[in-house]
Design a protein with these regions (language model features):
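Hydrophobic alpha-helical transmembrane segments in multi-pass integral membrane proteins
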Residues: 152-173
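Short, Lys/Arg-rich, polar N-terminal cytosolic tail immediately upstream
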Residues: 1-16
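Core segments of transmembrane alpha-helices
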Residues: 25-34, 90-107, 149-158
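Membrane-proximal helix-loop-helix units in multi-pass membrane proteins
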Residues: 99-152
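A cytosolic-side transmembrane-helix exit/cap motif
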Residues: 67-78, 132-145, 166-169
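Juxtamembrane helix-capping/reentrant segments at transmembrane boundaries
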Residues: 75-94
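Loop-to-helix transition at the N-terminal end of transmembrane alpha-helices
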Residues: 45-61
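Short, hydrophobic transmembrane alpha-helix segments
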Residues: 34-49
Length: 173
C-alpha cells in the first residue's frame, strides 16, 4: 500500500516536470539548435558529426509525424502490445530521453566517431519498426504514424552513412 502511494506521488511529480510535459517541443528546439550549428560550422566539423546533426533534425521531424501530424504512433504500439499504460506522458518522455542519448551525446562528443553508430542503428530500425507496426495496424494494414519520414529521410541517410563509414573513411572513425 505504501509503495503504491509512493509510486503515484513520484509519477505525479514527474508529470509536472517541464521536460516531461513538453518533451516534443524540447526535442524540436534542441534539434533546431543542432541543425543551425551544423549548417554554420559545416566546413569545420568531422563528417560523422555532420551526419549526427542531420540525423537529430530528421528524428525531430519524424517525432512530429509520430506524435502530432497525424500522431498516435506510441498509442498504437501500446494498444497493439496490450501494455497497461493509461497516461502517454511517460512513454513520450522516454522517447525524448532515447533521442537525447542517441543523438545529442554523439553530436557533442564528436571526437568519438564510433558514436555515430547509435543514430545509424536508430535510423535503420525506424523504417523496419514502422513497416511492422503498419502491417499490424488493423485500420490500414500498411501505414503507421512515422513511416513517411522513416522511409523518405532515414533510408537515404542510412545508405549514405553506411557508404561513408565503410568506403570513404573506414579507418578514421
Amino acid at each position: 500500500m505504501e509503495y503504491a502511494r509512493f509510486t503515484k506521488l513520484n509519477l505525479d511529480l514527474i508529470k509536472k516536470n517541464f521536460f516531461v510535459r513538453n518533451s516534443l517541443y524540447v526535442t524540436l528546439t534542441l534539434a533546431g539548435i543542432v541543425m543551425l550549428y551544423t549548417i554554420i560550422n559545416w566546413n569545420t566539423m568531422p563528417m560523422t558529426q555532420r551526419i549526427t546533426g542531420i540525423y537529430y533534425f530528421l528524428i525531430a521531424l519524424h517525432e512530429i509525424e509520430e506524435m502530432k501530424f497525424p500522431g498516435g504512433f506510441v498509442e498504437m504500439v501500446v494498444k497493439l502490445t496490450g501494455m497497461p499504460v493509461k497516461d502517454m506522458t511517460i512513454p513520450h518522455f522516454c522517447l525524448f530521453m532515447i533521442t537525447v542519448y542517441m543523438m545529442l551525446i554523439p553530436f557533442c562528443l564528436s571526437s568519438i566517431h564510433w558514436l555515430v553508430i547509435g543514430p545509424l542503428v536508430l535510423g535503420t530500425i525506424e523504417p523496419i519498426a514502422h513497416f511492422v507496426v503498419g502491417k499490424a495496424n488493423p485500420a490500414t494494414k500498411i501505414y503507421s504514424p512515422g513511416i513517411i519520414t522513416a522511409v523518405i529521410f532515414m533510408i537515404p541517410l542510412d545508405i549514405y552513412t553506411f557508404y561513408y563509414l565503410f568506403s570513404v573513411a573506414p579507418v578514421s572513425w
